[in-house]
């Protein structure tokens, strides 16, 4: 469905080659994450030079996990009928829950091989992820996807003109859920950045990321129109978000009870 008639999802057209805004935004988010990851790694007593080699493993694993999750968990009825679309990731369809799973598996294999501390690096990744997600959600805006149910009149009146026009589908203004999640991710990043600067115990930042992001995702998912369902009316993304948020709470309690490591603040 054409969501933004006034925005072309293709940024640059060179002959048969189309460079889409979605791809530009995702690549920009990844590049910023790698750069910031080096700075945050140094703060945690890690080698910033390791970030590049880690990213070479983590980024493809995350993208692969995001795509596999989108195709085989969320949208298999569609892709089973359109197998030619499976590899067309530039058209959208990268699920963050799959990216986290794919990245976690790759990190769990790669970091011990390089004798690197898993949870310290998890904190670095957990810190940059919400910022990358906040940026990446604007790829949904340009790619004309991830909008919600019809918005109430009071909200429509508060929307700036460009957003109201962009969210109008068949004469009805829809919830800009991509924007809600982008803002929530920015708030999550801000909270985690404060925790990072306070040198909280190893594992706390990543655990809080799981809790905060997934709590917001659980709420926002309830009004999205592109949700996938299982067992009748249970939204897959909400179920996964609930499980990951609970996992985050368990990990958070565990890390807070552990003795502080070198480089942690002993008081938190």
UniProtKB/Swiss-Prot annotation:
One GO process term, biological-process aspect: lipoprotein biosynthetic process
Could you tell me which InterPro entries the record lists for this protein?
Lgt
The organism's place on the tree of life at top rank: Bacteria
Q: What is its EC number?
A: 2.5.1.145
The record's annotation in PROSITE patterns points to: LGT (PS01311)
**Gene Ontology cellular component list:** plasma membrane
Q: Which family does it belong to?
A: Belongs to the Lgt family.
**Full protein name:** Phosphatidylglycerol--prolipoprotein diacylglyceryl transferase
Q: Which organism is it from?
A: Symbiobacterium thermophilum (strain DSM 24528 / JCM 14929 / IAM 14863 / T)
